[in-house]
A protein has these predicted regions:
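Preference for protein termini
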Residues: 1-174
């Protein structure tokens, strides 16, 4: 049953130590990663379209950051007030006019999406600092393959295990 699989997943995550710290909690509380026992499968035709949009989004984020640290067209045009940029804790004045490799500022982007309806998705947030969810995604996939092997045998589900290799290749390229 689903309830048994939920218990099995929790036991394995606890035994292996797949937890996260609750920030701001002085007690240092460790919790199990949030794991949805019901697999969410995005059909290939939807993923293809979504992937294009997410790729474009990250490219646009890099263009935005480049503009902030160089010409500042978005500020000069009044689209975003200067104080909103320059008083932001993440703004780094020492990066002003610094050329970065391939104009890529965000080498890793954790884009959290939710499905709003058939073929409709929304972005909850873009995490460009430390998208720790990547490691959880890899562990989630391992757990899903363990709990639902027939699902992976019957369907052509895109692999994710090669992500660390892709990340390493990208980091070596800069």
């Amino acid at each position: 049953t689903v309830a048994r699989k939920r218990v099995e997943a929790d036991l394995i995550f606890r035994r292996v130590g797949i937890t996260f710290a609750v920030y701001g909690n002085n007690a240092g509380t460790e919790r199990l990663i949030p794991f949805d026992i019901i697999p969410r499968i995005i059909p290939a035709h939807e993923w293809s379209q979504l992937q294009k949009g997410l790729t474009q989004r990250v490219q646009d984020i890099n263009l935005f950051i480049h503009d902030i640290y160089h010409a500042q067209h978005i500020v000069k045009a009044g689209v975003i007030p200067a104080e909103q940029i320059f008083r932001n804790a993440q703004y780094r004045p020492e990066m002003q006019d610094v050329a970065v490799a391939s104009d890529i500022y965000a080498h890793i982007a954790g884009v959290d999406i939710v499905r709003a309806g058939a073929g409709e998705f929304y972005v909850l947030e873009d995490n460009l600092r430390v998208p720790s969810g990547v490691s959880y995604m890899l562990e989630d996939r391992k757990m899903m393959m363990r709990l639902f092997p027939d699902l992976f045998a019957r369907h052509r589900i895109a692999p994710v295990a090669h992500y660390p290799d892709l990340l390493l290749d990208m980091l070596r390229s800069v």
